[in-house]
């Protein structure tokens, strides 16, 4: 550094430094970050999280149904903590009890801020599929995943991520009458979606929250994915019991989900066991982690 100063002179160096700083300030003033999308990065600025959480609180607490959702978010650890922790890694093992149904078992890392995900087979680490936020892809042979990976990419998040996944745009909330479940009074909120929201906007969820703690106890839902129901319609409603909640870096998440057919608003025949394990928030990932890898096939 001393040698450099001797070469160019102290005055010239100071002029250059000041000019660079002024140019940097000018450039920074002209660049306004998008507060909702981070391209090719897993790190979310704290100010963006604060802004998104503030807007979510204002929107949700403006209605009685939204207030229940907000209170549940707080009870489960808070929307800010959910986003601050970064992408969530977990093994999601979906095990139908019916013999003709396909098990879906993968380790995934999902980015709830941008709805991006990468799944890896639990038996072949080279077999992967995912969603970039825009493109669904797969990199595996034809036998690795015997199910619709495009449909399944973000499905686990929407089965286990309530109430946090209700913060987005296009979400409609309706407060239904209280109901009794497992001898407890529950607050009940129905979630629907605007047309054009996601691949299956006709889906709905009916969420049962403990009226005292606001922790999620059960989820009723339908599947209306157009590739499965080309003429419209949906499957019969399912009733999903929420099992033990575990603390993952300050966020309470389910380790077990038990799915039944719904009968008169309550659980009927038990049809699917879902075990969620190895949950951890992953703070350090390559910037291109959620991009479609070389050699992958676009779905």
Positions of predicted regions on the chain:
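Bacterial N-terminal signal peptides that target proteins for export
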Residues: 1-9
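Compositionally biased, proline/threonine/alanine/serine-rich low-complexity intrinsically disordered stretches
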Residues: 13-14, 25-54
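C-terminal motif of bacterial Sec signal peptides marking the signal peptidase cleavage site
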Residues: 16-19
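Bacterial signal peptide processing site
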Residues: 21-23
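N-terminal mature ectodomain segment of secretory-pathway/periplasmic proteins
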Residues: 34-37, 51-144, 172-180
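Flexible, processing/modification-adjacent segments and terminal tails
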Residues: 61-65, 130-203, 227-233, 285, ...
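Extracytoplasmic
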Residues: 85-87, 168, 184, 252
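Gly/Pro-enriched, hydrophobic low-complexity segments
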Residues: 186-291
């Amino acid at each position: 550094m001393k040698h450099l100063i001797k070469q160019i002179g102290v005055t010239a160096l100071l002029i250059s430094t000041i000019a660079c700083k002024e140019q940097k300030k000018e450039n920074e003033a002209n660049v306004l970050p998008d507060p909702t999308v981070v391209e090719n990065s897993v790190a979310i600025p704290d100010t963006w999280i604060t802004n998104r959480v503030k807007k979510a609180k204002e929107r949700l607490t403006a209605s009685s149904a939204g207030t229940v959702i907000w209170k549940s978010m707080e009870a489960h650890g808070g929307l800010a903590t959910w986003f601050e922790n970064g992408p969530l890694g977990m093994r999601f093992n979906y095990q139908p009890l019916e013999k003709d149904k396909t098990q879906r078992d993968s380790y995934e890392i999902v980015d709830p801020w941008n709805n991006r995900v990468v799944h890896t087979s639990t038996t072949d680490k080279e077999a992967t599929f995912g969603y970039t936020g825009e493109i669904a892809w797969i990199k595996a042979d034809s036998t690795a995943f015997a199910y619709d990976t495009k449909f399944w990419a973000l499905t686990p998040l929407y089965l286990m991520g309530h109430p946090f996944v209700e913060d987005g745009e296009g979400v409609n909330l309706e407060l239904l009458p209280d109901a009794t479940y497992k001898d407890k009074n529950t607050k009940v909120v129905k979630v629907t979606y605007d047309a054009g929201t996601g691949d299956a906007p006709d889906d709905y969820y009916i969420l049962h929250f403990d009226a005292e703690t606001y922790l999620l106890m059960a989820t009723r839902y339908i599947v209306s994915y157009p590739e499965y129901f080309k003429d419209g319609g949906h499957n019969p409603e399912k009733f999903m019991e929420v099992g033990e909640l575990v603390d993952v870096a300050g966020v309470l998440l389910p380790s077990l989900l038990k799915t039944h057919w719904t009968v008169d608003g309550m659980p009927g025949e038990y049809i699917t066991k879902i075990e969620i394990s190895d949950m951890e928030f992953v703070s350090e990932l390559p910037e291109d982690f959620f991009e479609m890898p070389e050699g992958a096939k676009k779905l």
